[in-house]
From Swiss-Prot:
InterPro entries: Kinase-pyrophosphorylase, PSRP. The lineage of its organism: Bacteria, Pseudomonadati, Pseudomonadota, Gammaproteobacteria, Lysobacterales. It catalyses: [pyruvate, water dikinase] + ADP = [pyruvate, water dikinase]-phosphate + AMP + H(+); [pyruvate, water dikinase]-phosphate + phosphate + H(+) = [pyruvate, water dikinase] + diphosphate. It comes from the Bacteria. Bifunctional serine/threonine kinase and phosphorylase involved in the regulation of the phosphoenolpyruvate synthase (PEPS) by catalyzing its phosphorylation/dephosphorylation. It comes from Xanthomonas oryzae pv. oryzae (strain KACC10331 / KXO85). This is Putative phosphoenolpyruvate synthase regulatory protein.
Amino acid sequence: MSTIRPVFYVSDGTGITAETIGHSLLTQFSGFNFVTDRMSFIDDAEKARDAAMRVRAAGERYQVRPVVVNSCVDPQLSMILAESGALMLDVFAPFIEPLERELNAPRHSRVGRAHGMVDFETYHRRINAMNFALSHDDGIALNYDEADVILVAVSRAGKTPTCIYLALHYGIRAANYPLTDEDLENERLPPRLRNYRSKLFGLTIDPERLQQIRQERRANSRYSAAETCRREVAIAERMFQMERIPSLSTTNTSIEEISSKVLSTLGLQREMF
């Protein structure tokens, strides 16, 4: 039996919703080589027929039934896509009818509402948070009074991508502070962070994984040496424990999970954009 399986994320909008849900589903299955493709803005019958042809062709190529994760809100488009012979996983269908019964109201099919511009206030909060994250990345700026959270970690432990995710998806003003050699030698919380204890969250990482990441950045250097990575991680973890700073290992944790843990631990209540 072939382990290759073509998977299509099909949407009449950006496709972000279909891909996010589809990816979460696929991670529950191991031993398969999922060949994925996103088809966005399939918003009329002609585009749907073209998409169905692509899906059908992939099935013939790999000699297996394709999977379509579909977030098109128009039932007619979904019917055309189903003509491809693929396994259809409709993102909305299982929930619409129960919601209509519960709310005693019919749905109004609207394309792209999940990821459209909600309002200018939300938009500006998102942009301002992103600008804040970039200007406070890796200790560039140290004025943390306006920060919602300050991520603390050794270099290359996942601070920057987590800050950007928090800014883009939650409008969180996230700064990050890299632990320097001087900080690690003292093994105490850096003085510039002491007034912001309630905003601190530590990130740690497996030393071997850290070495792999640093080798890509600066190979065969003291910075990427195994001993350096082991020492820095060990000191950082002791510091977090001694200073009672909540922390999380990023080694086998997705950015989404890290961000969710940061928000819940620090009690930051924000809706996802």
